[in-house]
UniProtKB/Swiss-Prot annotation:
Heterodimer of LeuC and LeuD. GO terms for molecular function: 3-isopropylmalate dehydratase activity. GO terms for cellular component: 3-isopropylmalate dehydratase complex. This is 3-isopropylmalate dehydratase small subunit. The keyword Lyase applies. It comes from Escherichia coli O6:H1 (strain CFT073 / ATCC 700928 / UPEC). Pathway: Amino-acid biosynthesis; L-leucine biosynthesis; L-leucine from 3-methyl-2-oxobutanoate: step 2/4. The gene is leuD.
Length: 201
């Protein structure tokens, strides 16, 4: 069972870029592994580092700024997670420590993969995201409160409403991935299997 997501308060880092694709999130040369851990070290590798091996941090990239170390909420622009459908993208984000991504829109496959990996993608309007970028710029180190149960983001003096469909919300709040959903019906599955003829088992 995955970790439950009900509420999260975290430091916000502003990635002021639209159309951030999955190859930028986790470059293809790091996709050999099939476990979900270890990808955070290579998150935004080509932007975070000046060398291919990831040894020399790029001082001009926002994730490397001292005031954003330990950030767990990523603020981005429209069409976040576009490109190929690699599930490694949310793996890299969560392994780095992100719990929430806020943007005006997400690529459909990335959006679905995020829920499967307990990464909450929050859609707000362009105008609301503009407000949040301005707020973070004026208040480096600001924390947002994200409440999945109430479907609200509290930022400064304002509260922003977002909508997550009921099924995905239920899964995240109960820490259920695809396997967890199946295991909810473990007794019913076992009962069904016991009723099958021996040659079908």
């Amino acid at each position: 069972m995955a970790e439950k997501f009900i509420k999260h308060t975290g430091l916000v880092v502003p990635l002021d870029a639209a159309n951030v694709d999955t190859d930028a999130i986790i470059p293809k040369q790091f996709l050999q592994k099939v476990t979900r851990t270890g990808f955070g070290a290579h998150l935004f590798n080509d932007w975070r580092f000046l060398d291919e091996k990831g040894q020399q941090p790029n001082p001009d990239f926002v994730l490397n700024f001292p005031q954003y170390q330990g950030a767990s909420i990523l603020l981005a622009r429209e069409n976040f997670g576009c490109g190929s459908s690699r599930e490694h993208a949310p793996w890299a984000l969560t392994d780095y420590g992100f719990k929430v991504v806020i943007a005006p829109s997400f690529a459909d496959i990335f959006y679905g993969n995020s829920f499967n990996n307990q990464l909450l993608p929050v859609k707000l309007s362009d105008a609301e995201v503009d407000e949040l970028f301005a707020l973070v710029k004026a208040n480096p180190g600001i924390h947002f409160d994200v409440d999945l149960e109430a479907q609200e983001v509290k930022a400064g003096e304002k509260t922003y409403r977002f909508t997550i469909d009921a099924f995905r919300r239920h899964c995240m709040m109960n820490g259920l991935d695809s396997i967890g959903l199946t295991l909810q019906h473990d007794d019913a599955i076992a009962s069904y299997e016991e009723k099958q003829p021996a040659f079908m088992r």
